[in-house]
Regions:
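H-loop/switch region of ABC-family ATPase nucleotide-binding domains
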Residues: 128-130
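Helix C-cap/helix->beta junction micro-motif
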Residues: 117-121
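ABC ATPase nucleotide-binding domain "signature" loop
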Residues: 100-104
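Conserved hydrophobic alpha-helix in the ABC-type ATPase nucleotide-binding domain
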Residues: 110-114
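Walker B catalytic acidic pair
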Residues: 96-98
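Short regulatory helix/loop adjacent to the ATP-binding pocket of P-loop NTPases
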Residues: 135-146
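Phosphate-coordinating catalytic segments in nucleotide- and nucleic-acid-processing enzymes
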Residues: 1-80, 86, 92, 149-150, ...
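Loop/turn-to-beta-strand initiation segments
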Residues: 89-91, 122-126
Length: 183
């Protein structure tokens, strides 16, 4: 499964995979409370003027369920990423610029859920980013996933591009204690 930096804006999701796994669905709703604290559920409504179905979010804040596309990009991106994890079970998930559209206040819980669920569902995930803040949140969101992480940075050495590989713990140490900027 591949997720581009703007895929959340295109409305293409993997929610059917989520709706078939009640435990993960409930966990996902819990994380989505960082985006809308009043969220109750997400469901598929196949009755639409265009003949196509839409995903709707029921929230205590609104009198009726609203289409996901009226929510902010952060909510859409979080739903996309979490549903993609489940759709990629026993496979590979590629996420380019994983942090786009996600507010920094919601990153920790969202990233923790993604990493821990990838581990549980046997999903190998590759993420790219240029955001120091997002990389820091990713590294520090789940202690139990640190040893499973590998972080690669590129740098110049004698007019050539070299690669540095570190596990999650070494990356945090390099960043916090040696001032290495990881992005």
């Amino acid at each position: 499964v591949y997720i581009s930096p703007i895929r959340h804006a295109e409305g293409l999701l993997y929610l059917n995979a989520v709706l078939e796994k009640p435990e993960l669905y409930e966990q996902m709703l819990s994380v989505l409370k960082d985006y809308d604290e009043d969220i109750i559920s997400i469901n598929y409504d196949n009755v639409n003027v265009t003949g196509r179905g839409v995903y709707k979010i029921l929230s205590k804040s609104h009198k009726k369920a609203l289409p996901l596309n009226v929510y902010g990009d952060g909510m859409k991106k979080a739903v996309l990423l979490m549903s993609a994890v489940i759709a990629a079970e026993d496979g590979v998930l590629l996420i380019d610029e994983f942090e786009t559209a996600i507010h920094t206040s919601a990153m920790k819980n969202t990233f923790r859920w993604i990493l821990e669920t990838c581990r549980k569902l046997n999903v190998q995930v590759f993420v790219t980013s240029h955001s120091k803040e997002a990389i820091d949140k990713l590294l520090k969101c789940s202690e139990k996933c640190l040893d499973d992480m590998a972080l690669y940075t590129l740098y110049k050495k004698e007019n050539m591009t070299a690669v540095r590989r570190m596990n999650g713990r070494k990356a945090i140490e390099a960043q916090d204690n040696m001032g290495l900027e990881l992005r």
